[in-house]
Amino acid sequence: MKPIVKYQGGKTKELKRIVPLLPEYTRMVEPFAGGAAVAFNQEKDMWLNDINTSLINLYRVVASDMYYDLQGAIAPLYSMEHDDLSREFYEARDVINNSCVDGVLWAKSYIVVRQLCYSGMERYNSSGAFNVPFGHYKKFACYLSQGHHDLLSGATVTLSSAVDVINDSVEGDFLFIDPPYMDR
């Protein structure tokens, strides 16, 4: 299964090299989950953690019954053309930048900005606002599926420090530790 959203530093293209190296394990733990390409590929019990509140909100919405509302909210995007997608992108970016409390709207907006931003970038200005422009896509694409809902509904999803997650892991866990590259 592919990740729900594009994510900088994602491991989808490296899976053919990573998967053969994975040991036997009970649960995949990703302290720096990001797009969680490795965990979604394995389709096993997982613990996803990140400090990105929008990303963790998305995973929590998908894990819950709100998943069905989210699917309904993004469905119209698949038939939109460039100009409508551009409008949706900037509206979604405003939602992300204004601390939305509606979990489904926030999750939809995060999917929109991740899938339609320029070059898949995630960048914030000095005020903490997401400031990547629209990527001029002609069509919307997203891999959100019932499989993601089923997998995440049994997963542990946390917004915590990676150190806490590593310290709280137990025997049988496999920790896939791929920290972000902050100084590039």
Regions found by a protein language model. Name each.
Residues 10, 21-80:
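Conserved S-adenosyl-L-methionine
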Residues 1-13, 21, 66-184:
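SAM-dependent nucleic-acid methyltransferase catalytic core
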